[in-house]
Amino acid sequence: MCMTDVVIAWVDGDDPAHKRKKAQYLTGKNETKFDDVAGAMRYRSTGEIYYCVASVLRYAPWAREIYIVTDSQDPHVDEFVAHNFPDNTIPIELVDHKVLFRGYEQYLPTFNSLAISTMLWRIPGISDSFLYFND
């Protein structure tokens, strides 16, 4: 039996709540200075989460579990999977940043994928080896 999980970091940058949260931390900052690292293009959601999940389900049926790491958001992949992969047996679980950063809440919110990546090992029940995708 395969013991490899899949982790997908995902954010819906078009979500009004996410935009407000991010703006709260950029207010008063030089916007052009942050365009490269915090510009809207870096957070735009174009449905890539569905392509990623579909690719895993189709080409990695040996995966044990899929974890979608997000900041209080839900990509609603369950409906997509039920419709397109009715025989799917791979569990899909949402993992909030608060779970990853438990004990380090002072560093939240974070909009830095590198900071998030360093905490993936803290996903409860994650396998020793996992594939990491970042939208």
Predicted features along the sequence, with ranges:
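N-proximal low-complexity "stem/linker" segments adjacent to membrane-targeting elements
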Residues: 1-43, 47
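Short beta-strand-to-loop acidic/aromatic patch adjacent to the donor-nucleotide binding site
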Residues: 127-135
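Short, acidic, metal-binding catalytic loop of nucleotide-sugar glycosyltransferases
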Residues: 55-63
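Structural beta-sheet core signal
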Residues: 6-8, 68, 132
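A general structural motif
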Residues: 1-3, 63, 127-128
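Active-site-proximal specificity loops/subdomain of glycosyltransferases
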Residues: 26-44, 74-127
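Short beta-strand/loop segment that forms part of the nucleotide-sugar
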Residues: 64-73
